């Protein structure tokens, strides 16, 4: 029951996004939509002094942004949730 409700809700959200995308004539629509959904501006290509989520890093060098940590296993910055 919960799974079917989740799938129905996900389908409605997908239908809304596709409908909104079909009405939009701007080329940067996907970037704007993702920026609004996640409330971040990582898509503009701005230079910053730290590495964000998914950027490659070297463990132990503290290159990742605050609230992120370099994964020893995957060698990229992940969100640090603490222990």
From Swiss-Prot:
Task: Point out residues bearing the modification Leucine amide.
Answer: 81
Q: List the disulfide bonds.
A: 50-65, 57-70, 64-77
Q: Which UniProt keywords apply?
A: Amidation, Disulfide bond, Ion channel impairing toxin, Knottin, Neurotoxin, Presynaptic neurotoxin, Secreted, Signal, Toxin, Voltage-gated sodium channel impairing toxin
A GO molecular function held by the record: ion channel inhibitor activity
Q: Does the keyword Disulfide bond apply?
A: yes
Signal peptide (UniProt feature, chain positions)? 1-21
Gene Ontology cellular-component annotations:
extracellular region; host cell presynaptic membrane
Compartment(s): Secreted
Pfam families attached to this UniProt entry: Toxin_12 (PF07740)
Q: Report the SUPFAM superfamilies cross-referenced here.
A: omega toxin-like (SSF57059)
Q: Which family does it belong to?
A: Belongs to the neurotoxin 10 (Hwtx-1) family. 15 (Hntx-3) subfamily.
What is the UniProt domain comment for this protein?
A: The presence of a 'disulfide through disulfide knot' structurally defines this protein as a knottin.
Tell me, what does this protein do in biology? Lethal neurotoxin. Selectively blocks tetrodotoxin-sensitive voltage-gated sodium channels (Nav). Does not affect tetrodotoxin-resistant voltage-gated sodium channels or calcium channels.
Q: What is this protein called?
A: Mu-theraphotoxin-Hhn2c
Organism listed in the record: Cyriopagopus hainanus
